[in-house]
């Protein structure tokens, strides 16, 4: 498929024109780091991100065709901007009841959701992981039955949520059953909103499993996480079932949460990516996923030979194909120890916690990256002692967190209130102010406005959180 790159073409032409730059930015195209000649602002012909009529409009139309959406909008400020805009639009599109707006959301949400709740002043009712789920901060699998039950429970309280919000894929690579959740939302007349920050590439697999294709009303993609796009490049995708379709309203929502000086370096990267996606990238993507599946099988076969208590590589139909998530319990160590061992072998992971290590691959990783990783892990497997115990199921910790959770004030009141930092061990009974998270994965243990409970303190200490902000 042939694909134009109008933003790239315009900026390159301007950079080569010799025009005197009597406008921002202050570097005037003079190279300090090398990219400055291509770094421009919204001059004549460069279009305007939040009111495009020219090259940006053309480029976004290209992205819309590639993703098969009703409309795909660019963001130069990551999925965080898109999440806020998406929630703003869902609020705008919801029937006005005169009551406080409520969002039904899976608990493993990024802190951007809490910031949006503070800014837009809505409440959140949480979907928690089931008692059968493996306990992990990053995971919250939601079944269609659980969602149906939660919606019915809210209806009995006279609450009609303005949206259902899930994160899929999550930080450990787990994916929700989006078609089943979308069917429930469609039957209940509630839009399904998906934080698909880690799944932009899903559209380009042999079997399209992008959230919009599977029935979500809106979703955000961090292009920079899994596609060849520089940091900050993202999309807000609308399906044909999105509650708001008016283009001006969507751009207004993005502008509300975005800078008036969008990066043209990021816009060029998004534009250039269209041509890549229209070329042989899907083929290379399939090859990458196949190589990772082969690596998973090889590692798990080696782990079985060593009689490890669990598979080394997390696998299954509910795992996305382009993350390699390692269960350090297979080696008898913590995820942070395993990450340090890989670091000593000149490999930097995406994320590590007490149990897991997350490694992110794309088609841009050369073959030697796979070889280096496999060699290092096989050496670690060879040193595994016999008779390692099975890891403890930590689901009870999250069940306790759910049972003890009490919301003492709204998220907005907590985030905007007077705050003080205290050690975690002195926070019992205080009210969480700003969410205390590590980044990655930026998922809060205690939510703003919640009382700090014994279960919350235990989890914070397990995940290495030493201080948090509480209301004075």
Q: What residues fall within each predicted segment?
A:
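N-terminal "arm"/small-domain region of PLP-dependent enzymes with the aminotransferase-like
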Residues: 1-54, 190
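Conserved PLP-enzyme active-site core in the AAT-like
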Residues: 3-12, 78-311
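Short, glycine-/Ser/Thr-/acidic-enriched flexible segments
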Residues: 29, 171, 225-226, 241-243, ...
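Conserved N-terminal alpha-helix of the aminotransferase class I/II PLP-enzyme fold
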Residues: 36-81
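Short active-site oxyanion
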Residues: 70-72, 99-103, 445
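Generic beta-strand/beta-sheet core signal
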Residues: 106, 127, 167, 195, ...
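Conserved C-terminal alpha-helix-loop-beta "cap" of PLP-dependent enzymes
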Residues: 300, 304-448, 454, 459-463
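Terminal helix/beta-alpha structural elements that buttress the NAD(P)+-binding lobe
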Residues: 467
